[in-house]
Regions:
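N-terminal "first-domain core" detector
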Residues: 1-59
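Beta-strand-rich solenoidal segments
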Residues: 5-6, 50-182
Length: 182
């Protein structure tokens, strides 16, 4: 099937949905957080088990997220015996038509691992930070927060999808043309 867009509507014969625009933008803008300011969507310790997610923007699958002010996030109480890792994510939820910051918690363990990111047709997550929640702690310090925004496998920064053009086919055609006319 052929598709084309975007044309002006004459007598409402051209209507476009959000997913049409998202598909268009996703073809040249990759997923990630916007790098300016450098503190965009940074997770910082606040008071007790509270964190702040700084003002910032993210882009997932052609959709835009904007946190316009410090967003307070509270972690669950620590276990008395075992540790866990909480992961702060920006979640794109197509079913509910929303993007938001969420906290995911690992299982309690002597050696916990961060919860996996969900990345499927309906939900896509970018990890902003991992927080080590030690047994019995009542406050999170900045040293327990691992910033994941620059980790390209977990988050990364917004960049052009086309990083480099493969010119091999064009080069082969050009070489064949030169060979024919020499």
């Amino acid at each position: 099937m052929e598709k084309s867009s975007f044309f002006n509507s004459v007598s409402h014969d051209r209507t476009y949905k959000a997913e049409d625009w998202a598909e268009y933008f996703a073809s040249f803008i990759g997923n990630g957080v916007f790098p300016v300011p450098s503190t965009g969507l940074q997770v910082v310790a606040n008071d007790g088990m509270k964190l702040n997610v700084k003002t910032g923007k993210a882009w997932i699958n052609g959709y835009f997220y904007f946190n316009t002010g410090d967003l307070a996030v509270e972690l669950d109480t620590a276990d008395g015996q075992l540790n866990r890792i909480d992961r702060v994510v920006v979640r794109w939820d197509l079913t509910n038509r929303v993007m938001s910051v969420k906290v995911k918690s690992s299982s309690f363990s002597a050696s916990p691992t961060a919860p996996a990111l969900q990345r499927d047709a309906d939900v896509y997550e970018l990890a902003l930070a991992d927080i080590y929640v030690g047994a019995g702690v009542t406050a999170i310090t900045q040293s327990k927060i691992t910033d994941q925004r620059l980790n390209t496998s977990l988050c990364g920064v917004v960049a052009a999808v086309v990083q480099q053009i493969d010119t091999a086919a064009f080069n082969a055609q050009l070489q064949a043309w030169f060979a024919e006319y020499q």
